Amino acid sequence: MPRATLWQRLTGAGFARFQAGDLIGVLPQGSAVPRLYSLASGRRDGFVEIVVRKHPGGLASGQLTALEPGARVTAFLRRNPGCHADRGRTPLILIGAGTGIGPLAGFIRGNARHRPVHLFFGMRHADSDFFYGEEMPGWQAEGRLTRLVTAVSRGARRSYPPHWRI
């Protein structure tokens, strides 16, 4: 992504057009094969955000999780219209697990119109896999997230998606 001024970052100007759910193709060093990740942010956020699970021996995930602030990667954006929340007012039910929370978090963050959004999120371990867990109470207080239901498959209090009530 090209460098953007502070004003461009605050207003979302100076970035290519993209939204949560679009894809970013990352070309890891040592490979010509891009790895596609769903974006957890939109242009108006002023940053590009993805959720990455580090795979043991994984080339791209290993490089991405080792990045320091200000580091650069070779990447491209690809629209993914099949993974966009429409602009309607009908309630939105989001279901995801693990790193699949990325675009869903982007939809919630971008819900400035306070559309009813219900998130059902599954994870293995609540202490390490509850991505965006610190932000969710704020999203609920702001009216961006109506309901949060979680399932944790490992640990002391296990629960599984079949036990969810929608």
Per-region residue spans from a language model:
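FNR-like FAD-binding dehydrogenase module
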Residues: 1-166
